Regions:
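N-terminal Lys/Arg-rich, disordered targeting/topogenic segments
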Residues: 1-27
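Substrate-binding cleft of extracellular glycoside hydrolase catalytic domains
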Residues: 177, 181-299, 310
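Juxtamembrane extracytosolic/periplasmic "stalk" immediately C-terminal to the first targeting helix
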Residues: 57-68
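Alpha-helical oligomerization interfaces
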Residues: 29-33, 40, 44-48, 52, ...
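Surface-exposed substrate-engagement region within the catalytic domains
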Residues: 269-276, 280-381
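Functionally critical loop-and-helix segments that line ligand-binding/catalytic clefts
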Residues: 9-15, 113-184, 334-381
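Short, aromatic- and cysteine-enriched interfacial helices/patches
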Residues: 1, 53, 57-59, 118
Length: 381
């Protein structure tokens, strides 16, 4: 152990050496710390360079793919197939969205068509009909009815393009450039005195003449048409083929047979070549006594009239309109009887079979001073 001097201090040479060692240690520590900082800075710099290089590569690839997609490139060098996966719920949602979009587009198309139809002056029912090809759109009591077209009923084969409408509104049916229909009228006391010679000269080939009617009030009295005899005689003398009709309001079998027997009695003296027609109509305004009949009751009474006429040796026929044929009669039970159909549009909308078409209630014919119903008979009598 070294001795201290008398003042308790380490001798000068030893102090000097101690200070030198202290300085050396301090310098070494500084150098170590400086080296560590340099290494850290170098690592950070290198990492930054690597990140920039990787990011540049990624960005370049992304730009290449975007450019290729925009240009429509399909090459393997510039694009990769993107595979998307969906859960069942996501697929269902996509389908529902597409379906809703299609429905919205179709709804807008339909609404646009309805708007165009109505603004052009077409009635609502006429506007709706093209959108329901498998149903008959029928207005009854202020409501729109969509009645499925029955496959079990006989259909007519009339072609719209074969209709020939003359300037005066007369309708003809053509085939191979030839008129194959016959011009006809139906009359009652409402037409007054008729010059049947002039009627024939105007091209009328047949006429349905009213025998009578049953009142649609509660009593339902039978009424004979006061012009029946003179109309039948005048038409036959002018060479016009004659059929007859009775406007029924029968609500029981007894009343129905009373009507049929009256008709048979009235036609007995004459040569009636064309059918005897059962005119079954709904009285507007809800006043008709037969309006409340069920479909089954009305169909049964109609069949009873036709069978009675047929049993007497005459040809029966049923007069009806769109409402009656779709909502108020079961035509399936009346298929064996010919039909006379009243419809005042020229679109041949009604699909079921009929031989005679009443196409106007406001016709004009020479020899008749009042408006008269116009008809055509399709094919041969």
């Amino acid at each position: 152990m070294k001795k201290q001097n008398e003042n308790g201090r380490i001798p000068e040479d030893r102090l000097s050496r101690a200070n030198k060692r202290k300085k050396i240690n301090t310098i070494a520590s500084i150098l170590v710390m400086t080296g560590c900082l340099l290494v850290l800075v170098l690592v950070t710099y290198v990492a930054g360079i690597l990140y920039s290089w990787i990011d540049s590569k990624f960005q370049n690839n992304a730009n290449d793919l975007a450019a290729a997609a925009e240009a429509g490139s399909q090459t393997e060098e510039s694009t990769q197939e993107v595979v998307k996966t969906y859960t069942q719920e996501e697929v269902d949602a996509l389908i529902a969205e597409a379906k809703q979009q299609a429905e919205d587009e179709e709804e807008n198309k339909i609404l646009s068509g309805i708007r165009d139809g109505l603004t052009s002056g077409t009635t609502m029912v006429e506007t709706l009909r093209p959108y329901y090809p498998n149903e008959l759109v029928v207005v009854s009591n202020g409501t729109f009815n969509f009645v499925p077209i029955r496959d079990d009923l006989q259909k007519n084969d009339y072609v719209l393009e074969n209709l020939n409408i003359l300037e005066d509104g007369e309708v003809q049916y053509m085939q191979d450039g030839q008129v194959v229909s016959h011009k006809g009228i139906d009359v009652s006391k409402h037409q007054g005195n008729i010059d049947w010679t002039k009627v024939a000269a105007d091209g009328v080939e047949f006429a349905f003449i009213r025998v009578g009617l049953r009142g649609y009030g509660t009593e339902g009295k039978l009424v004979e048409d006061e012009y029946f005899e003179q109309n039948v005689k005048g038409a036959l003398q002018a060479g016009i083929k004659v059929g007859v009709y009775f406007y029924s309001q029968a609500i029981t079998d007894e009343e129905l047979l009373e009507e049929a027997n009256l008709v048979l009695e009235k036609v007995k003296p004459y040569n009636i070549e064309l059918p005897i027609v059962f005119d079954v109509e709904k009285v507007s305004g809800g006043k008709g006594r037969a309006n409340e009949l069920s479909v089954e009751e009305r169909t049964r009474l109609t069949a009873l009239f036709c069978q009675t006429i047929q049993d007497a040796g005459y040809k029966p026929m049923i007069y009806h309109n769109m409402e009656m044929g779709t909502l108020m009669l079961d035509l399936g039970q009346l298929e064996q009887y010919d039909k006379w159909f009243a419809y005042y549009n020229d679109d041949l909308y009604y699909p079921y079979a009929y031989k005679v078409w009443q196409y106007s209630e406001k016709g004009a014919v020479d020899g008749i001073n009042e408006e008269v119903d116009l008809n055509i008979w399709f094919g041969d009598f």
